[in-house]
């Protein structure tokens, strides 16, 4: 059995991520809503018809940069805390706009998702396409299971993620 925080790849697809879409689920399965990125990414990859590769990450910035290094298209999903109502979903094109660092102020890592994206941008190491989906969490304390609002949002994240994969694969043909 794989540890849920593993940074090792899990694949629904075949071959390197450069041939399909890399979906990175970020989170901690043992901190309630922090698991939303992991749960959404798993469900998205199970539902996807296209060639996708799932990678689960704890959110440590350098590991994220290494994960997307060879990828042409990346969808990254994580839980955030911005003060919006639980279950609020954000979509950002990380090549075109900055990811708010304040979303990750409660991260247990010194080098967050937002900082990894900012550094990769400065080093010209962003993948050609990097879409960030973030869901507003409610409970980040120890425990398992998502709060009801976040659980509902995961279903919507999967729907939006499937649309994103369709757009990416349609444009790469």
Residue ranges and their predicted role:
Residues 2-137, 144-156, 160-172:
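N-terminal catalytic or cofactor-binding beta/alpha core of small enzyme domains
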């Amino acid at each position: 059995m794989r540890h849920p925080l593993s940074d090792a790849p899990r694949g629904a697809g075949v071959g390197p991520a450069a041939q399909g879409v890399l979906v990175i689920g970020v989170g901690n399965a043992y901190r309630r809503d922090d698991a939303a990125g992991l749960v959404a990414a798993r469900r998205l990859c199970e539902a996807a018809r296209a060639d996708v590769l799932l990678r689960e990450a704890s959110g440590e910035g350098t590991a994220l940069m290494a994960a997307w290094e060879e990828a042409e298209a990346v969808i990254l999903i994580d839980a955030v805390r911005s003060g919006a109502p639980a279950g609020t979903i954000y979509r950002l094109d990380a090549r075109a706009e900055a990811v708010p660092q304040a979303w990750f102020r409660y991260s247990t890592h010194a080098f967050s998702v937002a900082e990894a994206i900012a550094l990769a941008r400065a080093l010209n190491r962003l993948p050609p396409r990097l879409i960030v989906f973030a869901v507003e969490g409610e409970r980040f304390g120890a425990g398992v299971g998502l709060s009801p609002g976040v659980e509902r949002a995961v279903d919507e994240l999967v729907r939006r993620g499937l649309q994103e994969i369709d757009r990416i694969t349609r444009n790469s043909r």
